[in-house]
Curated annotation (Swiss-Prot):
Family to which this protein belongs: Belongs to the Ap4A hydrolase family.
Region: Disordered, residue numbers: 267-314
Family annotation (SUPFAM superfamilies): Metallo-dependent phosphatases
GO molecular function: bis(5'-nucleosyl)-tetraphosphatase (symmetrical) activity
Enzyme Commission code(s) on record: 3.6.1.41
NCBIfam families listed in its UniProt record: apaH (TIGR00668), PRK00166.1 (NF001204)
Record-given protein name: Bis(5'-nucleosyl)-tetraphosphatase, symmetrical
Main enzyme class: hydrolase
Organism: Xanthomonas axonopodis pv. citri (strain 306)
Low complexity bias locations: 297-314
PANTHER family reported for this sequence: CYTOCHROME C5, PTHR40942
Keyword list, A-Z: Hydrolase
Length: 314
């Protein structure tokens, strides 16, 4: 039995299939951890969502910002839905849309396996959050998403403010939690997210730090695997394993085996895109701050959503 974490798929169905073949995925005994952003931009979002849904008995999914945006689109009127990009429109107009979206809405913001020693999130954690606190706050929002009032949450989750504070309540609290789990890259030592800074470390504004290097952060008792930040490339540092390697931008799709002492990395080439949009960052070559052993690499080396800022960005 093997446990594999896989980076952001973003609607790259063919590439996902190639990666599953490369790791010799066997649903009878293996488990997949998907780091979120299953859909959008890759052109095959419906096929990708159907694939992951078909593997639901053999996989774990955490929600990314693009997944939440898809859920928000699915909760709108049909007239509003027709304004979204063709990749997501195919999902909300599909015959099996209700089954797919209802299943997606039941997924987590954070997944923890303490026996294995890992936590999976999409983007980041507040500097002062222990893994136990992160689980608790994730469950708060998951209960809202899975409950009867989820449409109100999806309408109110957009916006960059407020920053996280334990005293927050209502939709302000839910929005702050969602932004940390699904949009975070850089933050201040007090945990204020900088949503406009998306490049590689060293390009950010003064006073900002990668969320996993911010001064004063708590020590965490689990290794963390995440996606979201394609500009980082493959990065392993401070107990964090960032594996969004920009498959949708012409980078690679990455799988990381979690159940071995020596981390094993497997990659396949991503979409053959020469230049990402100007609003996106081209992924760097894999970046590791600690030596990675046991590598097995095949290669070396938002969608139209509400006009307000929110989970679709990045």
């Amino acid at each position: 039995m093997s446990v594999w974490a896989i980076g952001d798929l973003q609607g790259c169905y063919d590439i996902t299939q190639r990666l599953l073949e490369k790791i010799n995925f066997d649903p009878a005994q293996d488990t997949l951890w998907f780091c979120g952003d299953l859909v959008n931009r890759g052109g095959q979002s419906l096929e990708t969502l159907r694939l992951v849904h078909s593997l639901r008995a053999h996989s774990v999914v955490v929600l990314g910002n693009h997944d939440l945006s898809l859920l928000a689109i699915g909760a709108r009127s049909e007239e509003e839905q027709r304004k979204v990009n063709p990749d997501l429109l195919r999902i909300v107009m599909a015959e099996d849309r209700d089954a797919l979206l209802d299943w997606l809405r039941m997924q987590k913001l954070a997944h923890v396996d303490r026996e294995l020693g890992w936590m999976m999130i999409h983007a980041g954690l507040a500097p002062k959050w222990t893994t136990q606190m992160a689980e608790k706050h994730a469950r708060e929002v998951e209960q809202q998403l899975q409950g009867g009032g989820y449409r109100k949450l999806l309408r109110n989750m957009y916006g960059d403010q407020p920053g996280w504070s334990p005293g927050l309540s209502g939709y302000d609290r839910s929005r702050a939690i969602i932004n940390l789990f699904t949009r975070m890259r850089y933050c201040t030592p007090r945990g204020r997210i900088a949503t406009d800074d998306k490049g590689t470390p060293g390009t950010q504004a003064q006073g900002l730090y990668p969320w996993f290097e911010v001064p004063g952060r708590v020590e965490r008792d689990l290794k963390i695997v995440c996606g979201h930040w394609s500009a980082l490339g493959l990065t392993i540092t401070q107990g964090v394993h960032a594996i969004d390697t920009g498959a949708v931008w012409g980078g690679k799709l990455t799988a990381l085996q979690l159940d071995t002492d020596e981390l094993r990395v497997v990659q396949v080439p991503g979409n053959p895109i020469t230049h990402p949009p100007k609003t996106a960052q081209r992924p760097r070559q894999p970046r590791r701050r600690q030596r990675q052993r046991g590598g097995d690499q095949a290669q070396t080396g938002p969608a139209p959503t509400p006009a307000s800022t929110g989970p679709a960005g990045g």
